[in-house]
């Protein structure tokens, strides 16, 4: 038995990939074991914007959810990532064809830094929807000022420091991600933008 109030399990990749199938089956069984009201499925999808035709496409999300449902999992919340704001009529379409309440179709428009994501999720009421699902009453208003401060430092600080990383895989963007993040955190703590 675990003493945690929440356990977050992320399964990356694309729904239906052979590598992730055992994990998808494990969370399906886990949900059955603990009871549906004690497990929440959040599905993150890309809602592409096509510049040539100036339109947002919901079909990839619909197909992704269809594939997930074929594996026995109905998402409770769908987070729709897009480079543009998703109009309400498109969100309603996703809600209808994916069988998810419209208030649980959450958009997240691409941000300049990952540290803006909590602010974006709060703006879309993701935190409220999660608490509501588990029937937890929020006792206080969320204080996003620390996230706003971090975002401001990253995006607007004039002072910067240049650091070179020497390594075999420096051309791969995520090869030294943990080192990159550690240096970014050090920069935030010292009001500096870190240029790698």
Report the location of each language-model feature.
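N-terminal beta1-alpha1 cap of cysteine-dependent amidohydrolase-like domains
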Residues: 1-5, 11-196
């Amino acid at each position: 038995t675990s003493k945690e109030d929440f356990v977050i399990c992320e399964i990356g990749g694309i729904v239906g990939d052979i590598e992730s199938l055992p994990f998808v089956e494990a969370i399906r069984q886990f949900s059955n074991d603990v009871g549906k009201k004690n497990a929440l499925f959040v599905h993150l999808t890309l809602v592409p914007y096509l510049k040539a035709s100036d339109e947002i496409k919901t079909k990839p999300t619909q197909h992704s959810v269809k594939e997930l449902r074929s594996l026995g999992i109905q998402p409770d919340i769908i987070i729709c990532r897009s480079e543009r704001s998703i109009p309400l009529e498109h969100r309603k379409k996703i809600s209808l064809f994916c069988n998810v309440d419209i208030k649980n179709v959450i958009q997240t428009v691409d941000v300049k830094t990952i540290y803006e994501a909590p602010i974006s999720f709060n703006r879309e009421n993701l935190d409220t929807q999660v608490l509501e699902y588990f029937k937890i009453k929020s006792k206080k208003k969320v204080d996003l000022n620390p996230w706003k401060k971090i975002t401001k430092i990253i995006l607007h600080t004039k002072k910067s420091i240049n650091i070179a990383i020497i390594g075999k895989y420096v051309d791969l963007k995520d090869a030294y991600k943990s080192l990159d993040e550690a240096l970014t955190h050090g920069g935030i703590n010292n009001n500096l933008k870190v240029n790698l």
